[in-house]
């Protein structure tokens, strides 16, 4: 996608270990998605680094808010980063999801 911002973090061997994407959702509003961290490296700060880089990119282009859709199991991670739930949970592919957002 030509308008997407992709962040990929690599370990010291050059292997990708964490990733995320930022899209323009509406004027002044970004949408973060495709956040993933290698399972064995979770809780090591990789996800927070990806999220911070995506938020910085959103700010740099003038976004005032970012939205995301997360699996319910990741809720606490995003809440620690300042996100709050927006709306009711839903099921997708048998996994409960929630919409979250954060002002920048």
Which residues does each PLM region occupy?
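Conserved GNAT acetyl-CoA-binding A-motif
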Residues: 51, 57-71
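Conserved acetyl-CoA-binding loop-helix of GNAT-fold acetyltransferases
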Residues: 37, 43-56
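Conserved catalytic-core motifs of GNAT/GCN5-like acyltransferases
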Residues: 67-69, 79, 84-101
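Conserved short alpha-helix immediately C-terminal to the canonical SAM/SAH-binding motif I
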Residues: 50, 74-77
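A conserved beta-turn-beta hairpin within the catalytic core of GNAT-like acetyltransferases
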Residues: 24-33, 42-43, 92-96
């Amino acid at each position: 996608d030509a308008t997407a911002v992709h962040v990929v973090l690599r370990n010291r061997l050059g292997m990708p270990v964490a990733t995320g994407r930022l899209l323009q959702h509406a004027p002044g509003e970004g949408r973060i998605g495709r956040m993933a961290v290698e399972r064995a490296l979770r809780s090591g700060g990789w996800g927070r680094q990806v999220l911070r880089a995506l938020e910085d990119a959103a700010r740099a282009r003038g976004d005032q808010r970012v939205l995301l859709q997360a699996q319910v199991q990741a809720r606490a991670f995003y809440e620690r980063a300042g996100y709050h739930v927006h709306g009711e949970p839903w099921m997708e592919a048998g996994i409960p999801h929630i919409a979250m957002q954060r002002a920048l």
